[in-house]
């Protein structure tokens, strides 16, 4: 996957990703309309399909809500690269099939607007704009399968056939 980097800092919690006032719906399109709006009012206009979210430490901390990764995925973000993720967000992202990678070096080496290419299977992150490459820990095979099928529910459906 390849897209433009959209970059934010540390400790972005789930209440910032999708504010509680919008939790009365689980419609991905509606969630996408309000994704990150308390942090960046232009987020929904800034994101194009396939863009890559690049964030700092402890991304997705706070309340456990599947709405947060759903909103990000529905907004068009194809992958999140972070210095670190809150564990519950990490699991929720995998469960809905949103690719996520941890790499401090990549986050430090990518600027807003850079074109970034990601090979999730092998944990390779390339800053196409700067010609640099970074490594992240690739997922185990079963996690790759969950992401490939678009989330845990689709994965289970496929396996029980």
UniProtKB/Swiss-Prot annotation:
GO terms for molecular function: 3-isopropylmalate dehydratase activity. It is an enzyme of class 4 (lyase). Pathway: Amino-acid biosynthesis; L-leucine biosynthesis; L-leucine from 3-methyl-2-oxobutanoate: step 2/4. It comes from the Bacteria. The keyword DNA-binding does not apply. InterPro entries: Aconitase/3IPM_dehydase_swvl, AconitaseA/IPMdHydase_ssu_swvl, IPMI_Swivel, LeuD, LeuD/DmdB_bac, LeuD_type2/HacB/DmdB. Its EC number is 4.2.1.33. One of its GO terms (biological process) is L-leucine biosynthetic process. The keyword Lyase applies. Pfam families: Aconitase_C. It catalyses: (2R,3S)-3-isopropylmalate = (2S)-2-isopropylmalate. Gene3D superfamilies: Aconitase, domain 4 (3.20.19.10). Keywords: Amino-acid biosynthesis, Branched-chain amino acid biosynthesis, Leucine biosynthesis, Lyase. Belongs to the LeuD family. LeuD type 2 subfamily. Heterodimer of LeuC and LeuD. HAMAP family: LeuD_type2. PANTHER family: 3-ISOPROPYLMALATE DEHYDRATASE SMALL SUBUNIT 1, 3-ISOPROPYLMALATE DEHYDRATASE SMALL SUBUNIT 2-RELATED-RELATED. Catalyzes the isomerization between 2-isopropylmalate and 3-isopropylmalate, via the formation of 2-isopropylmaleate. This is 3-isopropylmalate dehydratase small subunit. It comes from Caldanaerobacter subterraneus subsp. tengcongensis (strain DSM 15242 / JCM 11007 / NBRC 100824 / MB4) (Thermoanaerobacter tengcongensis). The lineage of its organism: Bacteria, Bacillati, Bacillota, Clostridia, Thermoanaerobacterales. The gene is leuD.
